[in-house]
Each structure stands twice: as structure tokens, then as C-alpha cells.
């Protein structure tokens, strides 16, 4: 199946764009601003606030005199269990310093003390290199970049991507929905900056609007997906919510204890190790808590250093000065994604991807804390320069497009059931039996999808199922444990699997 919805572009309201960017996180906004500074007028399509806004910890860059991009590079490789794309990782850490200057030029005001960046230490880093704005770094970056796009006069449309129109000569445009109506944007250049797919898990830190279905749309249309088995689980999400408590809290001295008051893990280990340690405590029937009192004992005022965290803890009845708070691990970051090169190009002409929906390979098997915001701005900048060149040869077509798909059935699996399947069998611990069960279940559901009613809601479920299928297939193919991917039946790393997992549409009969 190529197009899921039924449409005729000749009957839809139409707009034309030289370059269309879907998504308004750091990747999308940085790309848009960079294009505008190159003299290109991009159009942004967004369905609202995404993960960038909620990022608390910060953005990693080797900006201090006793640090270096090479040390940052080495830390990133170590955390990624040496599956990282080495060239792309060097680009991240070396060019990252210059992109920090871009962010400041665009209005971001990082914390400083006596004229120097006030950085913090996070898990997996050998140096305190995480730049921050209190504990709302993402919100600061998002609001300042959004303000910059408005100052530059970049047009923003509000709507939801439904279909990518791709024909033999590449991208031709997109179908999107706005207030229940379908509309058409004609463009030869589409940049996806739509976020990851961690929300397909029952426990997740992702906001509801970040669904990952754009990865599924691109895959359905022929794009290659890379390393989808790697899903990072944040160790410390406040139990009963999707509110994460930043790594930076542990960097400042907070400790993890079980309900016996026992410490059971080094809090500054990489996220995958900390998350699994917590998960195993919970499996044994233990409750796990994050104790912030050691932070206060160092003389740090929690409400000043972590105002957002302090505020939502107090709103929910917790006093971090007096008691530890209950936490669980939750799906947080989709490390895999649409395969791209160092300039955001996918396997489809005219289709680019930046940020969490893409896979540059820089994170390897486990993302080093606070590298994701840096990836968005570094590769957003690089993608903008490639698009500037490609615009000379890629022009919009004048042809109209139709899809005659019909159907009236309802899906025989809902999104909540899928989330439970993914959490139970494709979560922090996996094995052949569980993965095979989920794969068969998803394929069975997808085999009936051609009869589903072609509604935007069913389209969304279909594309999320495709991403879930890629994730399961990747986990089955990788018969080892590496980084965030842990197989109980293959509990160690195997050198033969120090290679990328590539998933293409022709692997499945859909």
C-alpha cells in the first residue's frame, strides 16, 4: 500500500512551497532559520509543541577550556557502544560549538557565571559540558527560535501531515489535515522534523502530539529505516505521569533508592544501565524512589536550580526537601529512524529528515545525555545548506494526484493495546518468543488494513504499526545485547553485530 487516504489534489485547497518543513522542534526551526539566512523562503507545517519544549537537562557541547570536541566524541562513542557513525559523530561534536553560537545569536540565553558558561555533569559525560537554562533549556530554545522565525517572517501553518506524495521523480508534495479538512501543499523538497516514536509504548515521557507516524509514512513510501530496535528509556519519570525528572538532578547529587532505602546503581551510568537497574528492582516487587535531599544538602536550592521540576512535584503533593519521590523508567527517545546522510538526505529524492525522526547514526546503540538538541541544530544547519544546493535542480510539478482507495472496516487493534504489547515484549528486556509474538500480531492486523476505512485516524494507526513492526524486526535481527537493546536470550555484545540494522519495505508483504 502506498497512499492510505482517498484524495484528489485537483479538488483540494492548494498551496505551493519551495521547501516544506514538517515539525517545529529544534531541528525544524534551526533548519528554517538557516534556510532563511541563505535567502530561501521555507514553509513550516506543525501540529504543535513537541519534545524540544519539554527538554529539561540541556544541550551538550565542549565549550569550556578543560574540555574538547574529541573528548565529547569519545564519550559519545562509549555511550553508543561503538555502533556510532564515526564521521557523523565528529561532525556533531566539532561543529556543535559553532551551532551553540548560532543559538545565542538567535536569542537563546544560556546560564553563565562570571562570563563563563555554567555547565553541569550528566551521565556518561567525562566533563561537565551540558549547557542549560535552569531546568527549562528546551523551552528556552523553542520559544527563542520560534520568536526568531516570526521576526524573519517565516510562514507557519498548523495542521497534521497525512500523506507524502511521492512519484517516480521524487517528492511532489504533501496532504495535510486542518480542522477536519484535507489540503494539499505542492513542493519538491520536504524536510521531516516530526520527532520520534517513543510514544508507541505504554509508559512514555513523550507528549501526546509526538506520535512517530511520519516515520511510518516515509517508510510506507519507500524510505529506509535504520537501527529501529534502539529505543531509549528515561530512568526517572514521575510515577503515574509522563513528567520526566532530568538527568541533571542526578548530576547535582540526587540518588536512587528502593523501598528499603538501599542504593542499587551508580546514578551517573549511561541511561540504559540505570533504566534496567530500576526495571529489575520493580520486577522484584520493589518500589524505586529518587531522593533529591542530597542536592539540598550541598547548599543548592532545588526551587532555583530546578524550578520546573520543583513546581510539578509540589503540584502533585511531593516535597523533595522532605521525602524521595516515586519514579519508573519510560520510553523517552527513538534512537533509530529514517536513514539519512550527513546532510539530511534520505533514500528518496527530495525527502530529508532531521532530529529524532531521522537516524544519522551519531547515537549508536545508546544516546548520550543532552546530545539530541545538539544533533537537531547541527544537522538542521547542514541539511539547510544541502537543500540550498538541491533547489537549483528540484522544481515543483504541475500534475495532480489521486488515490482511489476504499474500505469500510474498523481496525481490529487499538493504539492502547499496541502500546501494552510494545511495553511488555519490546521494552527494556526482550527475547525471541515475545518479539515473534508481537511481530505476528502486528502483521495479522496489517494484513487487514487494505479493508480499513480511509480516515486520518486509521491512517495514523497504520503508520504507527509500521514503525512498531520495524522496531520489532530490528530487535529480532539483532541477536545480541548492545546499549538500550537488551535480549535476555543473547545477554552480551557480539562483535559480528557491530553493524547497522537496515529495514526496507520489501522485507514485508504488506
UniProtKB/Swiss-Prot annotation:
Pfam families: FAD_binding_2, Succ_DH_flav_C
Main location: cytoplasm
A cellular component term, taken from the record's GO annotations: cytoplasm
SUPFAM superfamilies per record: FAD/NAD(P)-binding domain, Succinate dehydrogenase/fumarate reductase flavoprotein C-terminal domain, Succinate dehydrogenase/fumarate reductase flavoprotein, catalytic domain
Reactions that this protein is recorded to catalyse: L-aspartate + O2 = iminosuccinate + H2O2
Family of this protein: Belongs to the FAD-dependent oxidoreductase 2 family. NadB subfamily.
Name this protein carries in UniProt: L-aspartate oxidase
Native species: Aquifex aeolicus (strain VF5)
Amino acid at each position: 500500500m502506498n497512499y492510505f487516504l482517498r484524495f484528489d489534489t485537483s479538488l483540494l485547497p492548494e498551496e505551493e512551497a519551495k521547501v516544506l518543513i514538517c515539525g517545529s522542534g529544534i531541528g525544524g526551526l534551526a533548519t528554517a532559520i538557516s534556510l532563511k539566512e541563505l535567502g530561501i523562503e521555507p514553509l513550516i507545517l506543525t501540529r504543535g509543541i513537541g519534545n524540544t519544549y519539554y527538554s529539561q537537562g540541556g544541550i551538550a557541547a565542549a565549550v569550556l577550556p578543560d574540555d574538547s570536541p574529541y573528548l565529547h566524541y569519545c564519550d559519545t562513542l562509549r555511550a553508543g557502544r561503538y555502533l556510532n557513525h564515526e564521521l557523523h559523530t565528529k561532525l556533531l561534536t566539532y561543529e556543535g560549538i559553532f551551532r551553540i553560537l548560532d543559538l545565542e545569536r538567535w536569542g537563546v540565553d544560556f546560564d553563565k557565571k562570571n562570563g563563563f558558561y555554567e555547565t553541569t555533569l550528566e551521565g556518561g559525560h567525562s566533563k561537565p559540558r551540558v549547557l542549560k537554562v535552569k531546568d527549562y533549556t528546551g523551552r528556552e530554545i523553542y520559544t527563542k527560535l520560534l520568536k526568531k522565525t516570526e521576526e524573519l517572517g517565516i510562514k507557519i501553518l498548523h495542521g497534521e501531515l497525512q500523506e507524502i506524495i511521492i512519484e517516480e521523480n521524487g517528492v511532489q508534495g504533501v496532504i495535510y489535515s486542518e480542522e477536519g479538512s484535507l489540503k494539499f501543499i505542492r513542493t519538491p523538497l520536504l524536510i521531516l522534523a516530526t520527532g520520534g516514536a517513543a510514544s508507541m509504548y505504554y509508559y512514555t515521557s513523550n507528549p501526546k502530539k509526538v506520535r512517530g507516524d511520519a516515520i511510518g509514512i516515509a517508510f510506507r513510501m519507500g524510505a529506509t529505516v535504520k537501527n529501529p530496535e534502539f529505543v531509549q528509556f528515561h530512568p526517572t519519570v514521575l510515577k503515574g505521569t509522563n513528567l520526566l525528572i532530568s538527568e541533571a538532578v542526578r548530576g547535582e547529587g540526587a540518588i536512587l533508592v528502593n523501598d528499603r532505602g538501599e542504593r542499587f546503581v551508580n546514578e551517573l551510568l549511561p541511561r540504559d544501565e540505570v533504566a534496567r537497574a530500576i526495571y529489575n528492582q520493580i520486577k522484584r516487587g520493589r518500589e524505586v524512589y529518587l531522593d533529591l535531599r542530597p542536592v539540598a544538602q550541598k547548599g543548592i536550592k532545588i526551587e532555583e536550580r530546578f524550578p520546573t521540576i520543583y513546581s510539578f512535584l509540589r503540584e502533585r503533593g511531593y516535597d523533595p526537601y522532605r521525602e524521595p519521590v516515586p519514579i519508573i523508567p519510560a520510553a523517552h527517545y527513538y534512537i533509530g529512524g529514517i536513514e539519512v546522510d550527513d546532510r539530511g538526505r534520505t533514500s528518496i529524492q527530495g525527502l530529508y529528515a532531521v532530529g529524532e525522526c531521522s537516524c544519522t547514526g551519531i547515537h549508536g546503540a545508546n544516546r548520550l545525555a543532552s546530545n539530541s538538541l545538539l544533533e537537531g541544530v547541527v544537522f538542521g544547519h547542514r541539511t539547510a545548506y544541502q537543500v540550498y544546493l538541491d533547489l537549483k535542480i528540484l522544481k515543483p510539478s504541475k500534475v495532480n494526484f489521486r488515490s482511489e482507495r476504499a474500505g469500510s472496516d474498523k481496525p481490529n487493534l487499538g493504539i492502547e493495546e499496541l502500546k501494552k504489547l510494545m511495553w511488555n515484549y519490546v521494552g527494556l528486556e526482550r527475547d525471541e518468543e515475545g518479539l515473534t509474538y508481537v511481530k505476528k500480531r502486528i502483521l495479522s492486523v496489517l494484513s487487514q488494513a487494505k479493508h480499513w476505512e480511509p480516515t486520518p485516524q486509521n491512517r495514523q494507526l497504520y503508520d504507527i504499526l509500521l514503525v512498531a513492526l520495524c522496531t520489532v524486526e530490528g530487535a529480532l535481527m539483532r541477536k545480541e545485547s548492545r546499549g538500550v537493546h537488551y535480549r535476555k536470550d543473547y545477554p552480551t555484545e557480539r562483535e559480528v553485530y557491530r553493524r547497522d540494522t537496515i529495514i526496507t519495505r520489501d522485507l514485508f508483504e504488506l
